[in-house]
Design a protein with these regions (language model features):
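Intrinsic low-complexity, intrinsically disordered or marginally ordered coil/linker segments
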Residues: 1-122
């Protein structure tokens, strides 16, 4: 679970987008399972906060705002995991230290970078 442009939020192990804040698909094309996310309160809003911030207000959030947003996303990822089969892993993005560092203004890149290893959601 890692937000990106174009409503992309979920990715398979090869890095292909498999869904957004409404649903995602697990499995092979033609034989996949749809995971409906519309009942997860706040997921769409959480994603759209990132989308607006990264596209229209790069580097506008403070470090504490990024941290709060990331922590809310972690809670949402745990809710998403409850809708999935136990044999399917869900990874949530992390950032290396300094965790909440943002790019300089001229980078115009939304603030999140310095990715670390994804966190497995149990």
């Amino acid at each position: 679970m890692d937000p990106d442009y174009g409503s992309a939020l979920f990715w398979d192990e090869s890095g292909c987008n498999i869904g957004d804040f409404d649903c995602f698909f697990i499995g092979d094309l033609g034989n996949s399972t749809k995971v409906d996310l519309t009942e997860i309160d706040g997921l769409r809003e959480w994603f759209l906060e990132w989308d607006v911030e990264s596209l229209y207000h790069p580097n506008h959030w403070t470090d504490s705002q990024w941290k709060d947003w990331w922590e809310r996303g972690l809670k949402l990822a745990k809710e998403v995991k409850t809708l999935m089969s136990e044999n399917v892993n869900l990874l949530y993005f992390t950032l290396q230290d300094p965790i909440w560092e943002v790019r300089p203004e001229e980078a115009n890149d939304g603030g999140l970078f310095n990715y670390g290893e994804p966190m497995k959601i149990e």
